[in-house]
Amino acid sequence: MKKFYVLLSTALLASKISYAELDLSRESLEKATGISVGYNTSWSSHYVWRGESQSSKDMSPAIGVDLGHSSGLYLGAWSGSITNGVYGAEFDVYGGFAFDLGPFSFDIGDLYYLYPGESNETSFNEYYFSVGTEIPLKMIGEDFSVSPYLYLAYAPKWFGANTPDVFYTEAGIEAPIPGTPLSISYTYGNVDVDDLEGDAEKANDVDSWDYYYVTLGFGEVLGLDASATYHNAPGYSGDAGQDGFFVSLGHEW
């Protein structure tokens, strides 16, 4: 048993040294080139995408990596588990340009959805634009502020369905709960499938639906960002749009 603890202590020390070296090398890279590297991992009890279940209410782990440049340009990749598809996985690649203009933060980019093992027809691009800001409300608290945002996106040939256009509109707001480490956010969105024909089942036989989320953020719990979310998609027919709750844990480094 003593030997086990010695080995464990040695492993933990080596891990800390490795992280320190990693942080140092990333810091050196950013100073020399303006390029930053970030990693993230998460676990969710249910993967819900714009009101639609992607994991049939099963848990979904995910991992991602991001490259950013001081100019505002960025690239990233993300992968998570789903219940559909040959290999039960979704792989996303994205790139764009983020910048600030006065009190507003803008983001313009392209997100490519890929489903390994499926035909190329199921993969598609989503061209997006978002704007957000932070509004201080000193009448509530000296450091209190709310953070609203607007997200607009256009996806041609959505999931390979015979549809010329799909538009996404989403707006949300987040605020801390004074005197606590908690935060609360509300998201409302719409998926609009234009001129649906052919593979209508890929849009669940509806031309559009609304969805919303209410999320309670717990801050950092045991080194992980934790949250609980209630979701609903009132205009979506079928089990994939049923309301419910899910919890999420995440970490970035």
What are these regions (language model features)?
Residues 124-204:
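Detector for outer-membrane/organellar transmembrane beta-barrel domains
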